[in-house]
Amino acid sequence: MCERSLTLANGLRCHLSHQPDARESSALVRVGAGSLHESDRWPGLAHLLEHLLFCGSAGFTGDERLMPWLQQQGGQVNATTQLSRSAWFFQLPAQALAAGVARLADMLVAPLLTGTAITQEAAVIEAEYQLLRHHAETLSEAALLDAAGGALRRFRVGSAACFGDNVTELQQALRLFHQQHFVAANQQLWLSGPQSLDELQQLAEAFAVRQSGGAAHSLLPAISAPEPVETLIQLADEESFWLSLFINGEESALRDNVTLLEAFWQDEATGSLMAQLRSEQLCASLQCEWLWQSADHSWLALRFSAPALSASAARRIEQLFWQHLRAVRAATPAQHRHYLQLAQQDFAALSPLTQLRGRALGSAPSADVPADFTGFIVALPQASCTRLLTQRQLSAVPYTTQGFCLQRAPWPQTAAGPIAPVNWSFYPCADVLHLPDLPVNGPPLLRANPVQPRETLLVRPAFYHTLSDEAALSWQQQLRPRLAALRHAGGSGRWQQQQGVWQLVIDLPDNAKPALQQLPGVLAALNAPVQPQPHRAAQSIVIRQLLEALPQQLLAPAAHPAWQAAWCGHSESVSQHAAHGLSEVVQTQPAPACAAALQHGVSALRCAANDQALLLFIPLPAADDASLAALRALALMFEPRFFQRLRVEQQIGYVVSARYQRVADVDGLQLALQSPSIGWRTLLQHCKAFLRDMVSELAAINDETLQGWQATLLAQCQPHQNADAASEALRKQQGLPVLTPEAVAALTLPQLQRVHQRLLRERRRWRLLINQRE
């Protein structure tokens, strides 16, 4: 990858990344204006403007706006409003980058900000605010920010009450905010893709042509270090201990040091911080996030989460955290470089858009170990700290901050007991590992042509075999330290749920014997008996609870799942070594997949939420390549229309989605809705009416539109990851549908109409999940 940074004549700063092997391109623009730049009269104004920029601009309206246009391209788009900055970003097929950048530039320079759009998006933000009032992460962040006082205690999300009913006055405030802050010198543009740096620079210069010059009015209220408070709040989510650190120093230096430290903190190998916390049943996961970043100080939050977490356990976690930090300081320079390389490898494996967001918003690893890494570690314990513990059951009193009502209580009096030194371990180790010689041959593996320069093994359950949550989590526990050891030996692996299917993906180098020697131990974990798992608290957003439940609600978990595997790579010797380790686990020649025994009808699930959510999954009527291509084309048509009708025009709620989805190996159309006020039967009627109305719209589709869908689908036929190529090879071997260029090229309008009619007609196959409202 090659990079270039430059500042154009009007002050726009540009960051360009040439990724020669990428098939998709991405763009992100960051504006130095966020919620803290709003006047006290208009809380939520920056958030509202974030929404409105997608609602049309001088050059692009209707279906040509960035969001619906990107959906037609099969791309992704989103935006975020933070305390001191906002960002808009997208990813799409590389050949469409110029058209996407043109739309992004136009919506930032010349948004329409019509009264109709303002009314619509103000209602959407009101629904979002009602959702966030019960969102665990939002309430936790509010409790943390409250400790700093001042402007951070002000309401920022926005609501119908704040915006009022004088649309003209609100429109004037929006235009003034836009005029003050959306100038070239207050923006930064990131572009990445297979285009050359010169081509990317030409796009950046075209983006900048219409950007206004001048200085931005971007003065921020002073943010001081938080009081060293210790607080408990009551939340229905899993329990968490938040340790926040207010750190002085230059922004990029702090970011680079923390990103490297996070590689140590997230390590799961024996002797790591996470391994120790899990062995003592103190913590299941650790997350790091920046609450605030500025030129000379930043505020870091560490979240330690578990099904249950007491105040004394939180004290123990913090003791181990500081002891581990001292051990990291004493690690060798070679070990510091090793963990930086791991962070760089993890970052390189992310999608182009996620990488771009990391570079723009502060999570990309540096090229070298920070110059004063050990000095940073020495100074970190002197940072101002706050502590927050969330509990499901708590004797609390209400406290309002930032527009949210927290159930708050003081930290109980708990004395921290003595802590014995832990034998922390870092890699590379000085100890010499004596591993057995590798076997030469193994049973044959199904082979797929690689699409990435690595050797990849995919191990997954037989088709239509879902795993219970208990089994998946049990194997995850078994695999964590083994996959971490593999990672330190030069390979990598992940146990992940992909499209509702748990699978093991292992990437191996073709010249690293230590990594190959770790492989048998990794694979043996899949033969380990399932261990009982603690109850997991549900997501606080109800539609996510339904999405998590869908795979097992569509296909009942298999009592004794069979395993299958495929290899994607060029190395014959590495493939043979991998196959040998599979002999006790995997069916090397699995039988053809049987027809899926799909569950259907309506199920009401108990969810901790006040909103009503509906998740409708309509399976593909005929499991063949031609029908799959038709379904994918229909989804391209439905996605923007469903959003426009139910989210923009009818404003039924905050979550509105229609898309193609593969769930537990079953292809289908997935409709998702969540509303604070509308019952599920009415939501279902909206879905049915939409599908019926698409009959006439589909009949009016012209050849040019169909050809556009075909072009989008053709770009999606080729897998982007080795694991996807291996999965596709298994599907082909067992006669399951895949998206092929031949099927896409042969699409006709009558074919789409036939598949659509079957989706409508075969309602007995529909799977509908709803939540039982509290």
Across the structure, where does each feature detected by a protein language model lie?
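A generic structural motif
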Residues: 33-35, 92-94, 188, 193-195, ...
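Acidic/histidine-enriched segments that form metal/cofactor-coordinating
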Residues: 31, 58, 63-177, 273-275, ...
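Non-catalytic accessory/assembly modules
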Residues: 116, 168, 188-191, 195-203, ...
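A structural supersecondary motif
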Residues: 242, 266-308, 481-496, 615, ...
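Active/ligand-binding-proximal structured segments within catalytic/core domains
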Residues: 18-69, 128, 253-265, 451-493, ...
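Histidine-acidic residue clusters that define the catalytic metal-binding segment
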Residues: 2-4, 146-188, 222, 252, ...
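C-terminal regions of mature proteins
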Residues: 339-450, 552-581, 712-774
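An aromatic/glycine/proline-enriched structural segment found at the starts
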Residues: 183-184, 188-242, 249, 565-622, ...
